[in-house]
Amino acid sequence: TASLCRYAIKHGFNGFQFLAGIPGSVGGAVSGNSGTALGHAGEIVREVWTMDSLGAERKVSGSQISWGYRSMNLPQGFAHKPVIILGAAFGFSPAQEEQNLEREYRLLLEGRKKTQPWGPGLAGCFFKNPPGLFSAGALIDRAGLKGFSVGDATVSPVHANFLVNRGKASAADFLLLMEKVADKVRRQSGVSLEPEVKVLS
């Protein structure tokens, strides 16, 4: 997503700025409908190329997809799921004459760096924000879990909805940390957190 965002800004394509600082691949951004308060992937996707579990490839229009909070639901007819995102086509609008895309991008990136952990070993926000007054990060913080670790998998002390690999954390470490965090939040706040990341196996 970082490369796509930079390419769009370099060529004056407006509407991609919300991707600034969002980690991961373009396929992951489409599959998870990545976004922020400024926009999300489903708003700019025009077509998606997929391959199902039997190897059959198919193209689907972005308007046929039901885009939800951190999710995309394909139309009926995709019997052999899950599908892999092979590619996507995006729509854009030209930047306005007075608009400075580079400045907008830089300000967004600087803002994220002040409020979120940065660098390798990150998967973005780990849990979906539940309905209600408090975000997932606020609930985890209220549970006193900033800095809590399982092996090298750690709840970021900067932003509690980021789980960070401090060096040699395994997938098992992250899964156990995810379970422990969700369990404590559920016991303390009565809220069941749902992972934003996709656990494949």
Regions found by a protein language model. Name each.
Residues 1-29, 36:
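Anion-binding (especially nucleotide phosphate/pyrophosphate-binding) glycine-rich loop
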Residues 14-18, 28, 43-48, 63-65, ...:
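Generic beta-strand structural signal
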